[in-house]
């Protein structure tokens, strides 16, 4: 009795909930690497002012060594992803990390493909 009721309930739920909701979820980002990079960019933006102030204390040679060491400890206490060195430019279409044209935020491969097919306005092949 209970199993048949559970089975009929499952059939009803499958009809009500669309199949896309139970399948793979799509997001704005191409893959997890791009999402990770976006999170790092947000973190670097949040801690940019604090990091700049602490680094200026660390690199100031006029201040006493004790104060510089305290600043070193404070920088070490900040999250790793707040450091702008960990940010990587990625292609917005493929998330490829290398060969990215910064102006268009596209990898060289995607850039050439789109330029060859006339999908980038103002871009044309060199003719001489």
From Swiss-Prot:
| Localization per Swiss-Prot or TrEMBL | Mitochondrion
Offer one example of a GO biological process linked to this entry. mitochondrial translation
- UniProt cross-references to InterPro entries, sorted A to Z: Ribosomal_uS14
Example of a GO MF term: structural constituent of ribosome
- Keywords linked to the UniProt accession: Mitochondrion, Ribonucleoprotein, Ribosomal protein
Q: By its UniProt entry, which Pfam families does this protein fall under?
A: Ribosomal_S14 (PF00253)
Q: Which SUPFAM superfamilies match?
A: Glucocorticoid receptor-like (DNA-binding domain)
* Cellular component GO terms held in the UniProt record: mitochondrial inner membrane; mitochondrial small ribosomal subunit
**NCBIfam families membership:** PRK08881.1
Q: What protein family does this chain belong to?
A: Belongs to the universal ribosomal protein uS14 family.
Q: How does it assemble?
A: Component of the mitochondrial ribosome small subunit (28S) which comprises a 12S rRNA and about 30 distinct proteins. Interacts with LIAT1.
Q: What is this protein called?
A: Small ribosomal subunit protein uS14m
User: Which organism's genome codes for this protein?
Assistant: Bos taurus
């Amino acid at each position: 009795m209970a199993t048949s009721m559970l089975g009929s309930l499952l059939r009803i739920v499958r009809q009500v909930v669309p199949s896309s909701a139970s399948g793979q979820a799509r997001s704005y980002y191409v893959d997890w690497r791009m999402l990770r990079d976006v999170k790092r960019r947000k973190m670097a933006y949040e801690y940019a002012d604090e990091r700049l102030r602490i680094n200026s204390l660390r690199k100031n040679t006029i201040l006493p060594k004790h104060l510089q060491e305290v600043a070193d400890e404070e920088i070490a206490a900040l999250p790793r992803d707040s450091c702008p060195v960990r940010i990587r430019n990625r292609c917005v279409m493929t998330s490829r990390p290398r060969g990215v044209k910064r102006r268009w935020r596209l990898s060289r491969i995607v850039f050439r493909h789109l330029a060859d097919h006339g999908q980038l306005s103002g871009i044309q092949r060199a003719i001489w």
